[in-house]
């Protein structure tokens, strides 16, 4: 497939105040609450959030399977709400691939093109191109029941890409795959998006999928968007406690504001230690105010008690192969988790119930909005 490679500063999807309310009166439920965002051309954009957050509802409205209660939805400068699903330049790949078992791989890929009444020569050329794109040429004449789950996923993608939609919608398409195959398909999806230049809108509750594949992520909760940003920005600079808690592992520490500076905020930990932490943009805190600090497990280390910011008791040590997690019960309550990457020849010298110190660079601690 020839990629047009549109620049990312061109808006493909513009959503303004989109709301979806199911039911009426006392039984009314707001699944999507005044959502606004833009998705650029040639972007891999992910809607990430827990079950029931509204991400699939939003995807279904883009596809045309649901009508919004109110709001505006534009695609490539045109009002999408005026068009039924079959007239929208989008295709959808679902969790269940919905392949036709009585058809071959090639026939499945050709089906949508046949429904669009494309010329036979064009269909044959496009099917061949799609088979090569998803690396399934050798399986062209097999029935879909004779191929693996990962191969079925590739066929579903090829069928959706064949009509050359402007936008491809993907509704948790990897959730049925095993762990190893899911990781392989993450790389495959990103490759396909890059090679085709088509805008991908991907829905998932899996943070690893979102961080691995996305150009940008919209983190959703309770029908609203809590933060939009690149994977590194979302992970390193969560806008609020929900985002910090949902994306990766995070330790939350109670602290008290001492003063604000140009480079951050001086806070006092429960241990009495004062550190200069990162403050959220636009956040205003007064001296004496209680605040919450977020510290990622990989940013902390065990250290001598004399150098420690926090003191606690080693409660558990969990080996994960590539790294080891240390669970420390802090003086005053609460658990702090540290992550250390394992190295060849590394030995474990600590024992459960040992008193340990916890250190972290102050600039890795971030004050969160509640």
UniProtKB/Swiss-Prot annotation:
Residues 13-247 form the ABC transporter domain. The keyword Cell inner membrane applies. Pfam families: ABC_tran (PF00005), TOBE_2 (PF08402). Its EC number is 7.6.2.11. GO terms for cellular component: ATP-binding cassette (ABC) transporter complex. It is an enzyme of class 7 (translocase). SMART domains: AAA (SM00382). PROSITE patterns: ABC_TRANSPORTER_1, ABC_TRANSPORTER_2, POTA. It catalyses: ATP + H2O + polyamine-[polyamine-binding protein]Side 1 = ADP + phosphate + polyamineSide 2 + [polyamine-binding protein]Side 1. ATP binds at residues 49-56. It is a peripheral membrane protein. Keywords: ATP-binding, Cell inner membrane, Cell membrane, Membrane, Nucleotide-binding, Translocase, Transport. One of its GO terms (molecular function) is ABC-type putrescine transporter activity. Coiled coil: none annotated. Belongs to the ABC transporter superfamily. Spermidine/putrescine importer (TC 3.A.1.11.1) family. The complex is composed of two ATP-binding proteins (PotA), two transmembrane proteins (PotB and PotC) and a solute-binding protein (PotD). This is Spermidine/putrescine import ATP-binding protein PotA.
């Amino acid at each position: 497939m020839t990629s047009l490679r549109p620049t990312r500063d061109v808006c493909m999807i513009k959503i303004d105040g989109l709301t979806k309310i199911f039911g009426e009166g006392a039984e009314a439920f707001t699944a999507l609450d005044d959502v606004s965002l833009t998705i650029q051309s040639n972007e891999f954009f992910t809607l990430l959030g827990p079950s029931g957050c509204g991400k699939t509802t939003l995807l279904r409205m883009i596809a045309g399977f649901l009508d919004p209660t109110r709001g505006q939805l534009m695609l490539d400068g045109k009002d999408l709400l005026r068009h039924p699903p079959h007239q929208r330049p989008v295709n959808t790949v679902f969790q269940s691939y919905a392949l036709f078992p009585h058809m071959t791989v090639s026939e499945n890929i050709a089906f949508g093109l046949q429904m669009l009444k494309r010329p036979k020569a064009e269909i044959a050329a496009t099917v061949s191109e799609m088979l090569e794109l998803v690396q399934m040429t050798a399986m062209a004449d097999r029935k879909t029941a004779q191929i693996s789950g990962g191969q079925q996923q590739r066929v579903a993608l090829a069928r959706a890409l064949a009509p050359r939609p402007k936008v491809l919608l993907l509704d948790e398409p990897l959730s049925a795959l095993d762990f190893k195959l899911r990781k392989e398909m993450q790389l495959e999806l990103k490759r396909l998006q890059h090679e085709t230049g088509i805008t991908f809108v991907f829905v998932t509750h899996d943070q690893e999928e979102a961080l691995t594949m996305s150009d940008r992520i919209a983190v959703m909760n309770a029908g609203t968007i809590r933060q939009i940003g690149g994977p590194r920005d979302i992970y390193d600079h969560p806008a609020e406690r929900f985002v910090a808690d949902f994306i990766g592992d995070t330790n939350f520490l109670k602290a008290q504001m001492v003063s604000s500076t140009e480079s951050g905020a001086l806070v006092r930990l429960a241990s009495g230690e004062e550190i200069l932490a990162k403050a959220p943009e636009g956040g205003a805190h007064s001296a004496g105010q209680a605040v919450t600090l977020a510290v990622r497990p990989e940013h902390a280390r065990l250290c001598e008690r004399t150098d420690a910011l926090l003191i606690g008791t080693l409660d558990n040590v969990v080996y994960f192969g590539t790294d080891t997690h240390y669970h420390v019960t802090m003086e005053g309550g609460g658990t702090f988790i540290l992550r250390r990457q394992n190295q060849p020849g590394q030995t474990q010298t600590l024992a459960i119930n040992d008193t340990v110190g916890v250190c972290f660079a102050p600039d890795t601690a971030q004050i969160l909005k509640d």
